[in-house]
């Protein structure tokens, strides 16, 4: 995972170009080994990115720090192409090269449902989520419920999933060195034990609005 993480730290990193390199060469290590040939593979790529690909010293140092944090905090690094990487994402045009996962749920189980919505959930909305998940449990005993751990609909979905015994995964827009919003710290440990927390963002990264898109 070190080369994958380092690759995402290259200056002027562009995901579309990165995915093209990955799909051409097959792994983060191969991208590193063929870094001086990137312009031949991506003739229309930004000259700045091509230049930055030649020097991996700082990105590799940052990747080692990230891996050490992951090892010390039971966080798994899921790289594109790994067996445990979410298969439903692999063919997406903007599939993350690296994801960080703390939890025990199988991200590739057969039944997965995403429940997301407004941060200003009404009483009616909260009751609808409760009834929907309880009815779903009666029909499908094994479902992974995925949401964004935000206020409103998201946190209601996670809490109701846990209430009926479903595993639930929160996809967050920040590194796993902290939790946002802090008000949801109480439910996060239960999610880690019965689901998980998933992100494509490294540690020491602010929860910017752009990461939620």
Describe every region a protein language model picked out.
Residues 1-130, 134:
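Short, positively charged patches
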Residues 79-213:
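Glycine-biased, small-residue-rich flexible motifs in mid-sequence functional cores and linkers
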